[in-house]
Regions:
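Segments of small-molecule ligand-sensing domains
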Residues: 252-295
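Bacterial N-terminal signal peptides that target proteins for export
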Residues: 1-13
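Bacterial N-terminal signal peptides
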Residues: 11-21
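Sec/Tat signal peptide C-region and signal peptidase I cleavage site
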Residues: 22-28
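A structural signal for short loop-to-beta-strand junctions that line the ligand-binding cleft
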Residues: 108-121, 126, 246-255
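Bilobed "Venus flytrap"/periplasmic-binding protein-like clamshell domains
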Residues: 32-58, 64, 124-191, 286
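Pocket-lining segment of extracytoplasmic ligand-binding domains
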Residues: 93, 104-105, 134, 171-270
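N-terminal (or domain-start) structured segment
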Residues: 28-99, 107-108
Length: 295
């Protein structure tokens, strides 16, 4: 299981800033809330749908109607919340941390001072998948291969870039660094267009299930001194193992590292909206967990 202690340091950083959000005045005009998620086949979209289903059950009481929006992922969601165009959104805990600190993808635009953590949802192991015929034994074997690094704006892409920097690699170290979205990398792998992909996701995931079932794709471990240093240095990372036999043709456990999926909002999001969403999830937590196996 994924140890949450290192990653929860991230949430503490943001949650410590969150009390202002709860003190914000309620807005009677706020009747619709939109949650930014990810691709339609991803866990964020399913988890967002689960949240909205629970919120909408009680809409007669609180007057708030919830809907999900498919987006480019974590970085996109944070930037769109900052722009006032989303009420809430999913974000990897590393993206959330970097946004608050003004690091990495947020260095040019500056810290997102109004970003607030609402709650954490599920662990997201970084999952590396290889084409069966590519003869990949470890991540370093992808050098000179065709590899999907994730679409710009996604948390997967942000985490991939941090790993490559730590390894001293550049995108040019791959024969091809494709930028496919999560629902595209599985078919591309099975069609022989890429040799592997990197994906931060809660498990089980349809985007991993499909290529392991359809073309015998293999999960590749992410371990070694570089990963050890990343986990030691970054408060939002923790080591995790993808269980043995979770996916077809992968009977062994796959050690890796990962983050937490979190729901974030702006300090400007009305407090009654945050309360209604949080109450809907935690008053119906057993039902929430049943709405997707990754929860």
């Amino acid at each position: 299981r994924m140890s949450l202690r290192p990653v929860l340091k991230t949430l503490a950083v943001v949650a410590a800033l969150s009390t202002a959000a709860l003190a914000a005045p309620a807005s009677a005009q706020q009747k619709f809330v939109t949650i930014g998620t990810g691709g339609v086949t991803g866990v964020y979209y399913a988890a967002g749908g689960a949240i909205c289903r629970l919120v909408n059950k009680d809409r007669a009481k609180h007057g708030i109607r919830c809907s999900v929006e498919s987006t480019g992922g974590s970085v996109f969601n944070v930037n769109t919340i900052k722009a006032g165009e989303l009420d809430l959104g999913f974000a990897q805990s590393d993206v959330q941390y970097n946004a608050v600190k003004g690091l990495s993808q947020f260095k040019d635009g500056g810290a997102v001072a109004d970003l607030r953590a609402v709650f954490a949802v599920h662990p997201e192991p970084f999952t590396v998948v290889a084409r069966k015929e590519a003869n990949i034994g470890k991540f370093e074997d992808f050098k000179g291969k065709r590899f999907n690094v994730g679409n710009p704006g996604s948390g997967t892409r942000a985490s991939m870039e941090e790993l490559l920097t730590a390894m001293g690699w550049k995108l040019s170290d791959f024969a091809l660094a494709s930028e496919l979205k999560a629902d595209e990398h599985g078919p591309a792998l099975c069609d022989g267009k890429i040799d592997g992909f990197f994906y931060g996701v809660g498990h089980p995931s349809a985007n991993i299930q499909d290529p392991t079932t359809s073309c015998g794709a293999k999960l590749v471990s992410l371990t070694g001194p570089v990963v050890d240093k990343l986990v030691a240095d970054k408060p939002y990372y923790a080591k995790v193992s993808i269980p043995a036999g979770l996916y077809p043709n992968n009977p062994q456990a796959t050690p890796t590292y990962g983050v937490l999926a979190t729901v974030v909002a702006s300090a400007k999001t009305p407090a009654d909206t945050i309360y209604a969403v949080t109450k809907a999830v935690f008053d119906n937590f057993d039902e929430f967990k049943k709405l997707h196996p990754a929860l």
